[in-house]
């Protein structure tokens, strides 16, 4: 295990302590967050000299749950005072580049993909990372049965969460005899063992060399040889699915596995209910634990898999065809790495691309070295240890919303906070996407010029929501004359953002995340997610639509003569989609936040911008009444992430500050005439404000799509 991770004692310079349960913990005062023009990564300082020369900042202490050492504030007596106190604290969390950073955590299993990819490619994991990953996973272990769920907040275990978390802990040094792993192993065997994990887990277990490739349903790269006009071409699939599939199909076609070591040999004996050499892996290709079979595959998919394995591969798959397909997907991998500066679309594609590059270019290839340099951008330190973010950060998204919140709280009129807004504007200006990617048709990338990404321009994927909110925030700041902005975003670039949004609307009136819907809804027949759904089609989302419509409405008020007819038509169709998406009970489902409270806030704000309020709009009234019906006895709102799965409102056990704030804003945007529900919500928020103006992290607020 030496080439994968150095010993904790040597690589953390003896600063590891033991918690009461015997687990190791690093010295949190030695962690630093690097801000490289917006790119984020955590570093552990090993020497005392580094610690002295590089003092820990307020924002680092905040993320780590340490005392920020900021002065206590007088307890707020009014909502305005509470907002001013929050503004005072929040401004201290701004990073040098002008952004705000935060965790973006949800699915637990993605951590395993990154760790396994690093392990099999001899990419050293810093010892401090290993210590904190172990802490994080044990903190997420389900108390009831000893397993892990697929989501970081899951209270029920799954096969994919259990097998992959178990594997990570073993790779990072936890012994098989640890009582917590004994419980997890027992549960995994009750699920049927690793042979009954979803296909995505099996794929990574094969890469690790602890499962045979016969157990994995095929990821045929030949799909990419079909013409783009083919309705089932991967170019028509949802962006994340086709991007992940590309590198995964290359690895599958090569049937590559890690050579193995003592740990992987032990895992072969631990993950299964019978001796490894006696397992009929081919017979378990479609085996799946019932707890993970949330979205059963259609019979058509099962038939295609059988025909591929039983007929096509043994009788018709010629080496020349396989090599041609491998060349095709390799070209796409190279282009993806180039266009994202080896960051990748997500940690899933990042991990698979690293393995593909390792296979193609060798352990010291330039592509492998580049992937190693950017690997750390996905890891995030929390109070409970080190997690893996869903992306390389949410810098643009958080900064855009931070600007709107600060302006609403009066930051622009307070000289103390004006420099904060100026820095935020500079960050947004720096990370607007100024050109399309090269050969965008060849690599199936949607035009992005003028848009904004989720994280940074280096990763470079334009997102409709971020473009909408980035445009609104930039215009809002540039409309404040006394800020004295020296580098304004030219009107031409603001128009580019408008063009970007106009180019994204689907025929439904709605907006997707990255691009227009390219394929037929019938692609849903090819769903293969098993434990997650809606992975094949580019769907419209309420929150993407509201962001686009709100931005276009705001732009047209400042520039009424630019593309007036097109903007009017687009916003009218978008408003129609928002109303059509409202459920019979008045709620809106939000996929990228939790969930009905999240979408309700955006929907009611957008309707209000269009002149539709509680007094004038049935949709607004129904939306407000839906949210009011969910208010808890303490005056707050709390919604569980389970709403995402069940597509109905699921109450959290406790009120949540963030969701209470969302609903209060929604009601105020809508002009709801009753003051008391809003007052009760604000009192709940104020009651949980801490002495320095901050609030503690509660349940996760971010969504994970249709999982």
Curated annotation (Swiss-Prot):
The PFTB repeats extend over 130-173, 494-535, 571-608, 620-661
What are the recorded GO MF terms, alphabetically? lanosterol synthase activity
* Gene Ontology CC terms: lipid droplet
List, alphabetically, the Gene3D superfamilies matched: 1.50.10.20, 6.20.120.20
- Coiled-coil segments on the chain, per record: none
Q: Cross-referenced SUPFAM superfamilies, in alphabetical order?
A: Terpenoid cyclases/Protein prenyltransferases
> What keywords tag this UniProt record?
Isomerase, Repeat
Protein's UniProt keywords contain Kinase: no
Biological processes, Gene Ontology terms: ergosterol biosynthetic process; triterpenoid biosynthetic process
Supply the InterPro entries for this chain.
SQ_cyclase_C (IPR032696), SQ_cyclase_N (IPR032697), Squalene_cyclase (IPR018333), Terpenoid_cyclase/PrenylTrfase (IPR008930)
Compositional bias, Polar residues, is annotated for 1-20
UniProt-listed Enzyme Commission number(s): 5.4.99.-
Q: What happens when the gene is disrupted?
A: Abolishes the production of arthripenoids but leads to the accumulation of a new compound that possesses a sesquiterpenoid chain with adiol group at C12' and C13' position.
Q: In which pathway does it act?
A: Secondary metabolite biosynthesis; terpenoid biosynthesis
Q: Which family does it belong to?
A: Belongs to the terpene cyclase/mutase family.
Return the PANTHER family for the record: TERPENE CYCLASE/MUTASE FAMILY MEMBER (PTHR11764), TERPENE CYCLASE_MUTASE FAMILY MEMBER (PTHR11764:SF76)
The task this protein performs is described as: Terpene cyclase/mutase; part of the gene cluster that mediates the biosynthesis of the meroterpenoids arthripenoids. The pathway begins with the HR-PKS atnH that catalyzes two chain-extension steps to form a reduced triketide, which then primes the SAT domain in the NR-PKS atnG to initiate three more cycles of extension to give a linear hexaketide corresponding to the polyketide part of arthripenoids.
* Name of this chain's protein: Terpene cyclase/mutase atnI
Species of origin: Arthrinium sp
Gene behind this chain?
Answer: atnI
